[in-house]
Amino acid sequence: NKGLNVFGLIIDMIWSSLRYGSSFVDYFNFRFYEKDHQKRRAYATMGFMYRYHREINDQKKIREVDSKELFPHRFGAWCNKSYVFTKDDIDQFNHFLLSKVGQKIVFKDPNSTAGKSIKIVSVTKKENLIYLGNQHLKDFLNQEFALKHSIYCEDFIIQHNSIQAISPSGVNTIRIISMVTKEKTVVIIAALFRISVNCPIDNYSAGNLAAEIDPVTGIVLKGGIRKRSACDDYHDFHPITKMPIRGFEIPFWDETIVMIKEAAMIVPEVRSIGWDVAITNTGPILIEGNSQWNKDTFQIPAGYGKKDVLLRYI
């Protein structure tokens, strides 16, 4: 569509991989085909980020942040309620589900990333039988325990009314990237508003939008854009609800930043963490942390490379 020569494009992709450490996906997501050398070298690419995460974070401590099962124990003061059930806990699981009839539950695979394993189901009771979505409880258990030894789930989060108005299809979270400096202070190096587009999850890799937030004010600076930015442009308004994205002020922003700065010092050896935060009508909730946070969300919404931001703290 941009009139580029295919052969020349392929050669440039290979050259960029060797010169900048970019993957072929990076080449298109960062729109290298329309950028000169100076702009390309400003990006934190796949090769750079692999080295960066290993150097900046203590690899012996990252499980305390990344594990969905350990996370509530380390960061429980700010977390959404979570539960783990094994085959020996079937009775407890039944009682738990009975207490959730008429509500939704979020099931996750503790070892999965990018929202690939998330299932949001409604709990119902019909003729004294419990159903999870359209699936009978017995069938659900047989399916789950055939693949793993335990079930991990969380309470469904009811997001803030103003965020719900922008996109009601999923819980729209805030990604905040923190950095513990060598002087043991915490700085916020990026904040992004992740916005679902007719999707039950808001993960960037699922075709949703992300928009850059001013870390100081909590105001969205630009419209949202998809990860495959080569096929998209900025959306100042939500594609479906038509509610404004650019200029939106995230509720409870000051409280959110205080929470993140406190949480970042729980495991300070993991210096750089990408936090996922949900905003409810009563305040922020910490969902999870990621020691190998995604470079795409960090840079694509901004429209330029931010490698220099990361180099300041090595």
Where do the language-model regions lie?
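A glycine-rich, aromatic-flanked flexible loop/lid motif
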Residues: 219-239
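Short, flexible loop/turn elements at secondary-structure junctions
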Residues: 109-111, 125, 155-157, 178-180, ...
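Glycine-rich phosphate/pyrophosphate-binding beta-alpha loops
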Residues: 115, 173, 194-200, 290-300
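Conserved N-proximal alpha/beta basic substrate-recognition cap immediately N-terminal to
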Residues: 1-98, 113, 260
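Phosphate-binding site of ATP-dependent enzymes
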Residues: 132-226
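Protein kinase-like catalytic core scaffold
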Residues: 105, 187-189, 285-287
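Glycine-rich phosphate-binding loop of ATP-grasp-fold ATP-dependent ligases
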Residues: 81-82, 105-135
